[in-house]
Amino acid sequence: MGADLPPKFQYAFRRCLFYTFVLVAWLFIGMILFPALCTPAVKQDDNEAGIFRLDAKRSDLLNVLWAETITNGEDDWSELADQKLELYEKALLQHYGIDLDKSDKSFASGLQKSFAISTTIGPLDVDDFTTLGKLIAVLYALIGTPLFLTVIGQLGKMVTSVWQGTTLWIVTIVYIFISAVIYDIVEGGSDDVPFIEAIFSIFLQFTTVGEVDNEFHGVLPYCIVVLGLALITALYQEMQHNIERFIHPFEYSFNRLCGNVERWAGEKSEDKKSIVTSRIEEENEDEISDYE
């Protein structure tokens, strides 16, 4: 560790490194455990948007095949027909929730589930878990989530020991932009998809909101999300302090108002108590006079 780095950074780095090893071991346990405790159900996507997409693909298939029948020979037509039919078959399987490659991605699916449970970045499909799997997931989260928050906390201390204020804002924005570029490349984004969708997707991951259709491919996206969470957490803490300082005068006025209301209510309560006490004393005097 360089001598020019702040001691706070060096101490946080050593703690972060240790807890990262522990977290990786915990995620590895989940990667092995969850595939055995999950039974993905085949679900039919019966919404109108899914049906509309299937109809559009079928119409496109028929139109292209009809046009190519007139202009191309038999060999070219067969090759094109195979390509179009393969695309339509994939869309049809996806519509009915059938994933032919699911068995090959069992460990990747287990890693994604363990990462989502530990980082609180969802969503997860509860139907994918067996009854025992749901119980194990609860116990797994009780250990994994605090462990992950510890890693994020140490990363946040490293970040704030180097960058603060405007510099932290600039670093976070630049990192989100670079992460969106990497995400777009890894996910194979097309030119027809606006780049703002990649930025929005990255922002959802960094703020632990997540998105329904997100699936990480490889280890790189996980590393990007962890560092992004640390940056966003440090930024949120700084914004929290700024907001508290900004609204402190209003909070002080509100506390004074509450104090005045409490004193007023206390005085009313004391008045009622004194009235009740005086009435009781008068009744006691009347009873004593009756006996005399």
Swiss-Prot record:
BP-aspect Gene Ontology terms: potassium ion transmembrane transport
Acidic residues biased stretches: 282-292
Keywords, comma-separated and alphabetical: Membrane, Transmembrane, Transmembrane helix
UniProt xrefs under InterPro entries: 2pore_dom_K_chnl
Residue intervals passing through the bilayer: 17-37, 135-155, 166-186, 216-236
Residue ranges of the region described as Disordered: 267-292
Intracellular or extracellular location(s): Membrane
GO cellular component: plasma membrane
SUPFAM superfamilies given in the database record: Voltage-gated potassium channels (SSF81324)
Membrane topology: Multi-pass membrane protein
GO function term, MF aspect, one: outward rectifier potassium channel activity
Primary subcellular site in the record, as a coarse category: membrane
Protein name: Uncharacterized protein B0310.1
Organism, scientific name: Caenorhabditis elegans
Upper classification of the organism: Eukaryota, Metazoa, Ecdysozoa, Nematoda, Chromadorea
